[in-house]
Amino acid sequence: FCAVAMHSGVAPGTADSAATAMAAMHGRREAHLPDPPQALAAVGAAMAPLPPLLILHGDADNVVSVRNAAATAVLWAESLGARAGPVRTMQRGRRHAVRVTEYKARGRAQVTLREIVGLGHAWSGGAPGLNYSDPAGPDASSLVWAFVARQFKKI
């Protein structure tokens, strides 16, 4: 993979059963990556090192805790030797504001965390009238597409 995107998910390694998945969703499990030899055996050498990651998560999500987004960002960034930059707040028009943190290594963003202010458990920027969709959020589909396209340009 040249890029990974995650919207309202849990960090790798936080669950290994239905019960631990529920605890992970509520932010009550610690995130961890498998030991490198286990990870390579499981997914092959193509996943070493980890690709850049985009994380989108609503700070009002009462199903999957936003703590998972931050835990994933830190875990992924640490594995790539990336450090957090300053948090920037962005807002376009009447859409929900977004707190953006970029974790950089070697001058490049390796992890981009976008915490969407006021977004519950819904697809950000989704179609109106659909379940689990919030049209007032930034357009997650466009953000993911643009992020992945930028990563393809680097290979």
Regions found by a protein language model. Give the residues of each.
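The feature captures the conserved acid-bearing segment of alpha/beta-hydrolase catalytic domains
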Residues: 11-109, 115-121
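Core-facing hydrophobic residues within beta-strands of well-ordered domains
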Residues: 1-2
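Solvent-exposed, flexible loop/coil residues
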Residues: 107, 127, 142
